Amino acid sequence: MMKEKLFYLLPLLALASCGEPSYKDASLSPERRAELLVKELTLEEKAHLMMDGSRSVERLGIKPYNWWNEALHGVARAGLATVFPQPIGMAASFNPEMVYEVFNAVSDEARAKNTYYASQDSRERYQGLTMWTPTVNIYRDPRWGRGIETYGEDPYLTSRMGVMVVKGLQGPADGKYDKLHACAKHFAVHSGPEWNRHSFNAENIKPRDLYETYLPPF
């Protein structure tokens, strides 16, 4: 009788072992599931996921994704959206709480747009949930054309505004999931010139200025 039970039980155990992989186990924490998923990736697959346009990994159920999305004063380049004042204008309000409310609204719109595009199986640039926002570089030289993206020349004000932007975009710290993922840019001494920003080395910045002015917002 015991042998007969084992005869029927062993195939069931074998089927159970061939079930959903552990990284799809919803009872595990997101951190643990991510850790398990990364272990399944090959080196080449990991490298492709580091690009702003990530390829799909079909064997693991990972869909393509574009990390390049912007929301400096509203959801950018993804159809109609609410347009708020430029960051330099919001900084002039000296009102961090208002900035939080602005980006809380922005995150709502971004999620709605992402839901729509995903329903159309579209995952192009500017349709995702990872925002290259806020710009917390220090605006010292008015010749820098991107100064309007910043919160001005003061590191303290820039820091306070930057914190509220991130909180508004990502949602409550104790939430189960982030609404969006914010990315403060451009680390660290990026305040012009623009044309050679990928090769320019700001060697004239003194250590004290670096740590007291440019790094605090990050």
Task: Go through each PLM region and give its residues.
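Glycoside hydrolase catalytic-domain context in secreted enzymes
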Residues: 18-218
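Sec-dependent signal peptide recognition
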Residues: 3-11
